[in-house]
């Protein structure tokens, strides 16, 4: 029986989702692309025939995320702080040029990345993707336009090594929907929190 003929059956919907990234309020997330996987194919030719074998499995990384940028909490600053906390230093003196990012710190700074697709009542994650070893390789702060009344947007890419699709489970709305404590930077570059 098709799902639309059964009143108890409900298809997964593209607008029912929560993306959890440390320090980023869930309500600022506008769009997210889900993970994908590709298995390469190796061909072997014998006489007049071609036989195909599975090769390496790679995850289609990065995923793309679009966020709106409120004044408070300042998502633009939060994302820049994540890049800086991962090891980036402004090149203001010779000593700063010796510092660079490491994967360990970049992954730790992002504080995890989980995409939850929700049930109709919002209490259950019918699909939960956990991106492993995820970090930010790209942040695009958007465009400004005198002729536009649109909300300011930021686009980020999140790269990862692999993704795990977890079992369905309950969603804790107090964690998913509340404005998280957002890190900001004071004039001396020290990380503070507000929220």
Residues covered by each model-derived region:
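Glycine-rich, low-complexity intrinsically disordered segments
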Residues: 1-195
